[in-house]
């Protein structure tokens, strides 16, 4: 009776295949993480551009109708802390602007308890912030002059400054918003 030869992979061949799969997996994980970070940064840049656009349209709404409301406050928009705070809260929740890096909050909290209380049903933190306390992924609104964001000069005094942060809290871009 002739012997039947069974062909199979050797242990070395199997180990080489496992090693190749491991290397490809580690390359894939690194590439995926880079893709995620790039997408998150692009999201924050879009949040910044939308914040500027929506803020300007709220201000324009007041110019068209003095009886309207901007950021849930009466027109005209004023360069005051309550408008700054309410703009951040309103833009975050009315336009669904989120910081993609922010940790989740407990559902059912109130944003801005003083000037424009907003009950938050979801478990996320707004992506537009009022004043200091910036984090990567945030869009912040301040009133100029405000150290260290904008020094006192005729081009910025009495105006809002909208900024966005990334790469260990480095300002990536800004826009001065004039209400006139």
Give the role of each language-model region:
Residues 37-67:
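Membrane-proximal N-terminal amphipathic helix
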Residues 9, 24, 37, 42, ...:
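Intrinsically disordered/low-complexity terminal segments and short unstructured peptides
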Residues 3-33:
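N-terminal single-pass transmembrane signal-anchor helix
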Residues 60-180:
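Periplasmic/extracellular, small/polar-rich flexible segments of pilin-like filament-forming proteins
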